[in-house]
Amino acid sequence: MDPLGPAKPQWSWRCCLTTLLFQLLVAVCFFSYLRVSRDDPTVYPNGSHFPDSTGTPAHSIPLILLWTWPFNKPIALPRCSEMVPGTADCNITADRKVYPQADAVIVHHREVMYNPSAQLPRSPRRQGQRWIWFSMESPSNCRHLEALDGYFNLTMSYRSDSDIFTPYGWLQPWSGQPVHPPLNLSAKTELVAWAVSNWGPNSARVRYYQSLQAHLKVDVYGRSHKPLPQGTMMETLSRYKFYLAFENSLHPDYITEKLWRNALEAWAVPVVLGPSRSNYERFLPPDAFIHVDDFQSPKDLARYLQELDKDHARYLSYFRWRETLRPRFFSWALAFCKACWKLQEESRYQTRSIAAWFT
C-alpha cells in the first residue's frame, strides 16, 4: 500500500473542517458586529447616545446642539418629557463634535454678537439641520443682527411672535386651593425698592426715578447704591410694599425678571415702566400692577403709592389675582425643552431675517 494513499483523504477532511470552522467564526463576528452597532451607539463624553458621523442621522430622538452655554454658564440638562407634558425627550448636548449629526443648533446671541462670522459654526451644515436663534435681551442690547440674516430657521425669545416663545414669566391657574400663606402685611415695613445693575444716568428709567424720588423715598440697591449680598434679594425685597420694575429699554413684550421675580416672588406690587399697559395686560390681570403711564407725572404716582400705603384694603386688592393664579418663572432648561417640543411638532424649514423681525 502506498504509504501516501490514506494521507490524501485525511488531509482533505481536515481542510474541510478548517474551512467550515473559519466560516462559522466569520459569521459569528459579523452578527456580533450587527448587534453591537444596533444596541450600542457611540457614547459621547456627556453620556448621551448619538449616531455615527456619516452626516445622515439614523436616530429617531432629535439631537440638539447648544453652540454655546448662555453667558458661558453650564446648567444641568433636563429630561424634556418631565418638564414639558406631552413632549418626547431630546438628546441635548453642548459637545460640538456632534455638529455634523445635529438636527438643530441653538445659538445664544450674546456669545456670538460681537463677531458673528467668526463665532458661528463654520463647517457646512447637513441638509435639514435647523438653526435656532435665541435671545432674552431686547433689540437695544443685541448687536450685529444683520450679520445673521440667511442663517437661522427658527427664533426663540421673550417675544410672543417668536417661533418658540420663552417668556420671563407667566401666570398659571392653581390646580386646587392656593397653597401659599396669606400676605403678612405686618412684615411689609418699607415702602418702595429698586434693584438696578446698569445705572445709565441718561436712561428713561433713571430719569423717571430721579423725578419720583423728589416726592417719595425709594431705596435703591445695586452697584454704587445700597449693597445687596448674593442670596439675600428676596429676603430684602419682601420687606417692601412696592417694587420699581423699570425695564432698561422699551420694546413689545419685553417684561423681564424685574417684574416676574424681583416683584412678584417678593410679594411686592410691581410699579412698571416698559411697554404699554395693554401689552402688560396680555400677560397679567389689570389689577396686578401699577403702570407709570396711568399718572400724569411722577408726583402723582408718588401720591398714589402713599395713599395705598395707608389704605390696607386698596393695597391688598393688588393681590386678589393670587387666589386663582400663581406666577411661574423662566429657566434655561425649560427654554431648551420648548425647542425640543417645537422640533418634533413642526418640520417646516424656513429662513428668517432676524434683523428685519427683531426691532
UniProtKB/Swiss-Prot annotation:
Highest taxon above the source species: Eukaryota
Organism: Pan troglodytes (Chimpanzee)
Similarity comment text for this entry: Belongs to the glycosyltransferase 10 family.
Coiled-coil stretches: none
Subunit: Homodimer and monomer. Monomer (secreted form).
Membrane topology per record: Single-pass type II membrane protein
Residue span of region determines site-specific fucosylation: 73-112
Name of the molecule in the record: 4-galactosyl-N-acetylglucosaminide 3-alpha-L-fucosyltransferase FUT6
Glycan-linked positions: N46, N91, N153, N184
Topology feature Lumenal, residues: 35-359
Function of the protein: Catalyzes the transfer of L-fucose, from a guanosine diphosphate-beta-L-fucose, to the N-acetyl glucosamine (GlcNAc) of a distal alpha2,3 sialylated lactosamine unit of a glycoprotein- or glycolipid-linked sialopolylactosamines chain or of a distal or internal lactosamine unit of a neutral glycoprotein- or glycolipid-linked polylactosamines chain through an alpha-1,3 glycosidic linkage and participates in surface expression of the sialyl Lewis X (sLe(x)), Lewis X (Le(x)) and non sialylated VIM2 determinants.
Enzyme Commission designation: 2.4.1.152
GO biological process: fucosylation; glycosphingolipid biosynthetic process; N-glycan fucosylation; protein N-linked glycosylation; protein O-linked glycosylation
GO molecular function: 4-galactosyl-N-acetylglucosaminide 3-alpha-L-fucosyltransferase activity; alpha-(1->3)-fucosyltransferase activity
Catalytic activity as recorded in UniProt: a beta-D-galactosyl-(1->4)-N-acetyl-beta-D-glucosaminyl derivative + GDP-beta-L-fucose = a beta-D-galactosyl-(1->4)-[alpha-L-fucosyl-(1->3)]-N-acetyl-beta-D-glucosaminyl derivative + GDP + H(+); an N-acetyl-alpha-neuraminyl-(2->3)-beta-D-galactosyl-(1->4)-N-acetyl-beta-D-glucosaminyl derivative + GDP-beta-L-fucose = an alpha-Neu5Ac-(2->3)-beta-D-Gal-(1->4)-[alpha-L-Fuc-(1->3)]-beta-D-GlcNAc derivative + GDP + H(+); an alpha-Neu5Ac-(2->3)-beta-D-Gal-(1->4)-beta-D-GlcNAc-(1->3)-beta-D-Gal-(1->4)-[alpha-L-Fuc-(1->3)]-beta-D-GlcNAc derivative + GDP-beta-L-fucose = an alpha-Neu5Ac-(2->3)-beta-D-Gal-(1->4)-[alpha-L-Fuc-(1->3)]-beta-D-GlcNAc-(1->3)-beta-D-Gal-(1->4)-[alpha-L-Fuc-(1->3)]-beta-D-GlcNAc derivative + GDP + H(+); a neolactoside nLc6Cer + GDP-beta-L-fucose = beta-D-Gal-(1->4)-[alpha-L-Fuc-(1->3)]-beta-D-GlcNAc-(1->3)-beta-D-Gal-(1->4)-beta-D-GlcNAc-(1->3)-beta-D-Gal-(1->4)-beta-D-Glc-(1<->1')-Cer + GDP + H(+)
TM region positions: 15-34
PTM comment: N-glycosylated.
Annotated Gene Ontology cellular component terms: extracellular region; Golgi apparatus; Golgi cisterna membrane
Regions of this protein lying in the Cytoplasmic compartment: 1-14
Keywords associated with the record: Glycoprotein, Glycosyltransferase, Golgi apparatus, Lipid metabolism, Membrane, Secreted, Signal-anchor, Transferase, Transmembrane, Transmembrane helix
Pathway(s) per entry: Protein modification; protein glycosylation
Localization of this protein: Golgi apparatus, Golgi stack membrane; Golgi apparatus; Secreted
